[in-house]
Amino acid sequence: MVLHFSNLARHKTFVLHWYRYTLRNVARQTFSWHLKARVKDITRTTIVKHKSDKSSWSIYILLRDLKALNGFLRNKKTAAAWRLLTLYSKKPLRSGASSPSVALEHSPPLQDPETVRNSHIIHSYIVERQQKNLLPLEIPAEYKTLLLLPLALHDHALKRLHLIESKLVRGPPKVSVNYTSAGKARIWFLRTAVNKNQRQSKALGQIIRREKRKNQKNIDYWEKCRVNGIWAWHEAAWEHLMETNTMLTESPAKYFDNERSRKRAASDGTSVKAVAEWLDPVFSSLDMLQAQSAEQAAYFEQYKHNTVLQGLQQFFARKSDKMYQNRKKRFESLLENDLPFVTPYFSQQNLATVMKSHKF
């Protein structure tokens, strides 16, 4: 009999992947904290609400709209994303009503990301000045837009400029050797200003994930061998009881606390021989798993000394120094040629525009 899609593990995994993908997208692609909170809340609520929904058509529409929401977030279409969320946050639609994605075209437009960002900047600027008694509590909206917004953007850009200056004073960025553990193995890599975040090697991420999966399988196999070994010990104890009419006094944990305990007890008589006959295959499997783990650890340790410390570290150190020198030249050019002529109230000559022209 064919299972209903709601009982399939792959369906649950698919929905979970889309949910996590949505959370990553909204964290990276939008500046609005309100929109971030709305996406997280409405997406989670909708998924929980339809957890027991058995209608394949209903689930198809929900997944289609979730895909559309991610497309809006990736393309910075926050207005469309907001409208889609608004339709899902309303009361349930009557029968025969159009789906949320169809009704998007008739919804009013909302503010663009730049306007939302400027609103946050001017709000922080006004609150900070009011706390210092530099601005009145009541300010007309026209004054905020025409008078205070350019000053707020200038102040925001000036803070960024001071941050850039403080980083340049510290000198070229350092090249650090880091590692992540995958069982006994340590996977070594370089962390620099050149290859950070999205510029980090994708192959490195694939290697780390692959090794962690392999290590988890190794742990799972080890646990299975331990469980099978305990059952094997009980079989050996029964065999010993049938042959000698005596019970074994030790516990099965003795043989798994120390992997060589069976060798030390090899001359103790038939009881140890019976235990050895049952446990030797298990110990062979454990030895093989340990050898694989040690081999991987030795490989990555050798890779660290032969590759990471020998060639890659010097290569990235040179690239980091070159990047620092280019950044320093651009900063000095900004200070000498453009900074003296900065004016907050001219869009082509304000500090943010000047910094952008120098790639800051």
Curated annotation (Swiss-Prot):
Keyword annotations from UniProtKB, A to Z: Mitochondrion
Localization: Mitochondrion
Superkingdom of origin organism: Eukaryota
GO cellular component: mitochondrion
Role description: Essential for respiratory growth and required for mitochondrial protein synthesis. Required for vacuolar acidification.
Family per similarity comment: Belongs to the RRG1 family.
Protein name (Swiss-Prot/TrEMBL): Required for respiratory growth protein 1, mitochondrial
Gene name as annotated: RRG1
